[in-house]
């Protein structure tokens, strides 16, 4: 099982991980089936040759080296220690009694006693030449994940694993996390859309933290997202577009067609929604002309206007502003008109009469991307569409 907490830093992801760990410890305070890799692992500490639970690498290696013979020997050794303690209690108590009697004091407890929390220290040494000199932090993380895979740990908590991994190795880290989640309960906190796009996503286990006031995490309600006005007739849509209005197939479409862009959008404060490549090129030019290209936003391509509505519903559930750009298209098609009206319920939008190319008076072929880019370079009426960037209620 893979549970995922996503959101910016400082919005409660790490707190949620720690709370989950505390819940598990309430079930058994001495449990040893939990392991956490924090966002700030100091890999130099992992090279030390003293056994300490904070040194994850050595702790895992020691656990993997254990077998029945070693455990039997440990148990016999601990029993022998307990026996020796019991046999020598009286001697230590007598010494304490003698010293206390000088001041007319009395001993309240045994001086020594057996303990159930025995520790075995300095059992192994990790030769750190390769770990220190040859491996980067991403490789060291992957080494730890492989050790965890072979260990008896059941609950794995990973706090921002992307912090340790170079982008070129992120797919390897993601693959190891996916493999871990087959037989173990893995909980990961991340603010990386790139990592999310590489993970096996179960939307039922996806929690979105985007409330700066530490509100409860949000979950996407896909049944609500695919619910639209009954006046829109799905039978009039093509077969692929119909799949965007069923919760299961909508999730499948996100994973297969929109995964990386979808998670980038979830991390955004504003999403510009578009249909195709010409919309994308126009929007990028419009952003640059209005000096908006450095603001926090994402561009989400839906591959068809009928697909807008469920995505608008998802993003608005999460408190993300949606600004759709769309063609008016056929005004005699009642279904198309109704879809347009639903899209226009967004606070800001751009609608093109009857399509973007006609609106801009572009006379070339819609499919000639190079010609369209050249046309945009010489287009001089971007100001007409700048209202989507201001605070007014005006739309174009």
Where are the language model's segments positioned?
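Non-catalytic alpha-helical coupling and interface elements of nucleotide-dependent molecular machines
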Residues: 22-25, 42, 61-66, 182, ...
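A generic structural signal for well-ordered alpha-helical segments enriched in polar/charged residues
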Residues: 22, 94-102, 179, 289
């Amino acid at each position: 099982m893979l549970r995922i907490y996503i959101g910016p830093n400082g919005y409660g992801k790490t707190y949620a991980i720690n709370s989950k760990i505390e819940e598990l410890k309430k079930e058994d305070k001495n449990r040893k089936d939990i392991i956490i890799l924090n966002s700030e692992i100091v890999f130099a500490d992992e090279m030390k040759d003293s056994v300490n639970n904070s040194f994850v690498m050595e702790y895992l290696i020691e656990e993997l080296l254990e077998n029945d013979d070693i455990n039997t020997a440990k148990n016999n050794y601990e029993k022998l220690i307990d026996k020796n303690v019991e046999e020598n209690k009286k001697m230590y108590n007598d010494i304490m009694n003698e010293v206390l009697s000088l001041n007319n004091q009395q001993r309240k407890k045994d001086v020594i006693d057996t303990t159930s929390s025995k520790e075995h220290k300095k059992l192994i040494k990790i030769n750190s030449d390769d770990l220190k000199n040859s491996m980067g932090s991403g490789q060291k993380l992957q080494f730890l994940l492989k050790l965890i895979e072979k260990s008896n740990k059941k609950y794995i908590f990973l706090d921002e694993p992307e912090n340790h991994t170079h982008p070129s190795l992120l797919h390897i880290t993601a693959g190891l996390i996916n493999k871990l989640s087959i037989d173990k309960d893995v909980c990961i906190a991340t603010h990386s859309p790139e990592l999310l796009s590489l993970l096996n996503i179960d939307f039922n286990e996806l929690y979105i933290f985007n409330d700066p006031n530490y509100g409860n995490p949000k979950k996407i309600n896909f049944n609500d997202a695919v619910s639209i006005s009954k006046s829109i007739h799905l039978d009039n849509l093509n077969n692929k577009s119909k799949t965007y209005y069923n919760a299961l197939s909508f999730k499948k479409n996100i994973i297969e067609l929109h995964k990386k862009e979808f998670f980038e959008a979830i991390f955004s404060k504003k999403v510009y929604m578009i249909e195709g490549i010409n919309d994308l090129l126009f929007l990028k030019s419009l952003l640059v002309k209005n000096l908006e290209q450095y603001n926090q936003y994402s561009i989400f391509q839906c591959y068809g206007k009928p697909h807008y509505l469920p995505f608008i519903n998802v993003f608005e559930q999460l408190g993300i502003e949606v600004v759709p750009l769309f063609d008016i298209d056929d005004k005699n098609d009642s279904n198309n008109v109704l879809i347009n009206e639903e899209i226009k319920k967004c606070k800001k939008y751009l609608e093109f009469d009857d399509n973007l190319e006609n609106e801009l008076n572009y006379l070339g072929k819609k499919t000639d991307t190079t010609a369209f880019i050249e046309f945009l370079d010489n287009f001089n009426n971007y100001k007409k569409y700048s209202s989507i960037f201001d605070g007014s209620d005006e739309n174009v």
